Amino acid sequence: MNIIQSGITAENSSIAIIIARFNEFINKNLLLGALDTLKRIGQVHEENILKIYVPGTYEIPTIASYIAKSGKYDAIIAIGTIIKGQTDHFKYIANDTSSSLSRISTQYFLPITLGILTTKNIEQSIERSGTKMGNKGSDAALAALEMINVMKKLKKVIYY
């Protein structure tokens, strides 16, 4: 019986982080959490991390698709914050972004992890970007590291 389990170091891996500028004061903390996890826990070298800024969360999938198609990266981390307002706009942005990233991930066999907050208010966003509720950017980076390792091990079992 073969069992594949993930590891968390990925020092020779290349990772792209796509960051939404909208709600930048929250996303900045998510990015810092992701970078800290990649470097300190994952041992990923600074020169192997590409940071790309886009206007908002809705624009992340377009860039993720472009990066995935290049085949140059081992994972993508999406960073953004969607805060519920008075209209249903929140739902559409969150659903479209999430489903698009999932589709890109499966289409290109590339881990894309979500450091995207979907919250009811600013307070919840602040709590999830490094205070009471941890840092979802850090969580997304950790998931990316684990998925990189699972994919590398799985390729050896399937293709070699």
UniProtKB/Swiss-Prot annotation:
So where does 5-amino-6-(D-ribitylamino)uracil get bound?
Answer: F22, T57, Y58, E59, T81, I82, I83, L114
Instruction: Give the top-level enzyme category.
Output: transferase
Q: What pathway is this protein said to act in by its record?
A: Cofactor biosynthesis; riboflavin biosynthesis; riboflavin from 2-hydroxy-3-oxobutyl phosphate and 5-amino-6-(D-ribitylamino)uracil: step 1/2
Q: What is catalyzed by this enzyme?
A: (2S)-2-hydroxy-3-oxobutyl phosphate + 5-amino-6-(D-ribitylamino)uracil = 6,7-dimethyl-8-(1-D-ribityl)lumazine + phosphate + 2 H2O + H(+)
The biological process GO terms on file are: riboflavin biosynthetic process
- GO MF annotations, alphabetized: 6,7-dimethyl-8-ribityllumazine synthase activity
What top-level branch of life does the organism fall under? Bacteria
Keyword Transferase assigned to the entry: answer is yes
What's the short name of a Pfam family annotated to this entry? DMRL_synthase
Where are the coiled-coil regions? Answer: none
| Alphabetical keyword list | Riboflavin biosynthesis, Transferase
Residues annotated as binding (2S)-2-hydroxy-3-oxobutyl phosphate are Q86, T87, R128
Per the UniProt record, which EC number(s) apply here? 2.5.1.78
Q: Is Transferase a UniProt keyword of this protein?
A: yes
An annotated GO cellular component: cytosol
List of catalytic residues = H89 (proton donor)
Look up the signal peptide feature and give its range.
none
- Explain the purpose of this protein: Catalyzes the formation of 6,7-dimethyl-8-ribityllumazine by condensation of 5-amino-6-(D-ribitylamino)uracil with 3,4-dihydroxy-2-butanone 4-phosphate. This is the penultimate step in the biosynthesis of riboflavin.
What does the record note on quaternary structure?
Answer: Forms an icosahedral capsid composed of 60 subunits, arranged as a dodecamer of pentamers.
Family indicated by similarity: Belongs to the DMRL synthase family.
Could you tell me which HAMAP family the record lists for this protein? Lumazine_synth
Write the protein's name: 6,7-dimethyl-8-ribityllumazine synthase
Which species is this record about?
Answer: Buchnera aphidicola subsp. Acyrthosiphon pisum (strain Tuc7)
Gene for this chain: ribH
